[in-house]
Amino acid sequence: MAAISASAPYVARDRDLRNRALVRGWLYVVLLVLFALVLVGGATRLTESGLSITQWQPIHGVIPPLNDAEWQEEFQRYQQIPQYTELNKGMSIEAFKSIFWWEWAHRLLARSVGLVFALPLLFFWVSRRIERGLGPKLVGILLLGGLQGAIGWWMVASGLVDRVSVSQYRLATHLTLAALIFTATMVVARGLAPHSEPAADRSTQRLAGFIVLLALIQIYLGGLVAGLDAGLSYNTWPLMDGKIIPGDLLILEPAWRNFFESPKTVQFVHRLGAYTVFAVALWHMIATRRRLPGSTHARRATLLFVLVLVQASIGIGTLLMQVPLHMALTHQGFALIVLGFAAAHWRGTKGAYPLPQEIVLRS
């Protein structure tokens, strides 16, 4: 009679490890493309190119204008929006082409991310390389990507009628969702990686997760700063307007609007957010080194603090230099590096996803 042995070795373990390595490698490629997409999106914003394409054509929009007549048609559409009539009137078609290519590249890269994610996902699913429990996570990321495309057009549409730029609310939402997709992808990839040490204690896990949350909030605040050009408002540090706490922070009515619409208040809150991330990362490093001396968790916590310190220095430099394009892009890109490492560290404190278990029948 057959007996069930739960302790029998899982015969497919090697296959599962190989599948995990393949899926993890694919997700790392997705992360690289996402990182490039965020950088190109930042350059599109900083060069004020985001409104140069006034239509959303998911399929036909892949093909740019191919002759003079098509370029004139595209330019005429741009000439009908407030950004042209109020800011760029008299722009030459050559100048228009320079901003058009940034936005076109951003949209093309966004479409590419969708393909880089969806097609391998379909292949891995059909070939049964996606283990149980992983499918919903990956489908969730795919759905977030679809939502991000819709939010991207929702953001662009806000600048086509009554404004000369996009809504800072929508810009911050678009940037934060990109960061959330990046975080989710990193967490899944890290969960599939081998871990050299057991999971950390609950307190270390919670604080590591809290840093991820703080980093996401700080990126949202950075989106508001970008949307309002608030980085150009006060280019001194550590003082603002000659004070630690500047005046007129609540000048708008109702008061909540100041935290989203006042450049001074938004920059001040972004500074406070940076100080908070710095302080919590420092505390996390000290606490982890005390609880788990010499561990991989402690080394990662130390590196995370160093990354936060570097990012803070880049932010201060960007402010003092009055937001040059290369510094602003570096600040945005390094924010994603800090976030990605924080997410990987948090998943690392929890350990790898359990390997699938199988009950083996023996006679």
UniProtKB/Swiss-Prot annotation:
Protein name as it appears in the record: Heme A synthase
Protein role: Catalyzes the conversion of heme O to heme A by two successive hydroxylations of the methyl group at C8. The first hydroxylation forms heme I, the second hydroxylation results in an unstable dihydroxymethyl group, which spontaneously dehydrates, resulting in the formyl group of heme A.
Residue stretches spanning the membrane: 21-41, 107-127, 138-158, 174-194, 207-227, 268-288, 301-321, 323-343
Reactions performed catalytically: Fe(II)-heme o + 2 A + H2O = Fe(II)-heme a + 2 AH2
Domain of life, source organism: Bacteria
UniProt xrefs under PANTHER family: CYTOCHROME C OXIDASE ASSEMBLY PROTEIN COX15, CYTOCHROME C OXIDASE ASSEMBLY PROTEIN COX15 HOMOLOG
Enzyme superclass (EC): oxidoreductase
Gene name in the database record: ctaA
Record's subunit section: Interacts with CtaB.
Subcellular location: Cell membrane
Organism annotation: Mesorhizobium japonicum (strain LMG 29417 / CECT 9101 / MAFF 303099)
Predominant localisation class: membrane
Keyword Transmembrane: yes
Keyword DNA repair in record: no
